[in-house]
Amino acid sequence: MILYEYPFNERIRTLLRLEDLFDRLDYFLGQEHPLQHHVALTTLFEIIDVAGRADLKTDLIKELERQRQALTALRVNPQIDQEALDAIIGEIEQGIAMLNQTVGKAGQLLTDNEWLTSIRSRAIIPGGTCEFDLPAYYAWQHRPAEERRADILKWARPLVALRAGTSTVLRLLRESGQSGKVIATGGSYQQMLSGRSYQLMQVHLDDSLLAFIPEMSANKYMLWVRFTQQDGDLRPRSVDADIPFLLKLCNF
């Protein structure tokens, strides 16, 4: 199955972007070539940019506190697996503690490190990190891969709590919904939301339907899923086939 996700608000959109960037950082940091570690470092800059646009730390703490209260209330329910519930609450409490221990905003990493600031200012220029522009960075790229990796991990350490909080919130959100089989008749599907508020929509497609691309949109009244198909380099075009898929609407 291939999964497409659509956030209903800017807060969830930001968390999804951070999740994607952290995954990219992991991948390129696990490689060995200097160019791959260059991508890891520029990805770290992107994470700092996204995380610095809003007070994510406060938002995450508030959401985790809200989830802890809701889950704690379930301890009186004998039908709930108390061991699993305690594990989830423990994870949430650990995330809150880690976030409370962090000092400053994500962008503080750049303002405190002039060398990283100089690399970032050149990295946004096409071809701006050549050896004649940043000889010190060029020399760093020729250090052993283990040293480069250790440096990037050190620079990313202030973001560990933010990543843990983001991961926990998104996991709880994704687990909050139930999937249902629907069909996009003539390539299009729409559903009234009947006043219910959602934060995330998921579309699960069978691998055999990989050629069909869902374009999703929603407002507080209705959601739409319109399937398109792309031929070569041409723009995606609408399709009129009946396409089955799994739809999941998630909300805390």
UniProtKB/Swiss-Prot annotation:
The keyword Mitochondrion does not apply. Transmembrane segments: none annotated. Disulfide bonds: none annotated. GO terms for cellular component: cell division site; cytoplasm. Cell division factor that enhances FtsZ-ring assembly. Directly interacts with FtsZ and promotes bundling of FtsZ protofilaments, with a reduction in FtsZ GTPase activity. PANTHER family: CELL DIVISION PROTEIN ZAPD (PTHR39455:SF1). This is Cell division protein ZapD. It comes from Cupriavidus pinatubonensis (strain JMP 134 / LMG 1197) (Cupriavidus necator (strain JMP 134)). The lineage of its organism: Bacteria, Pseudomonadati, Pseudomonadota, Betaproteobacteria, Burkholderiales. The gene is zapD.
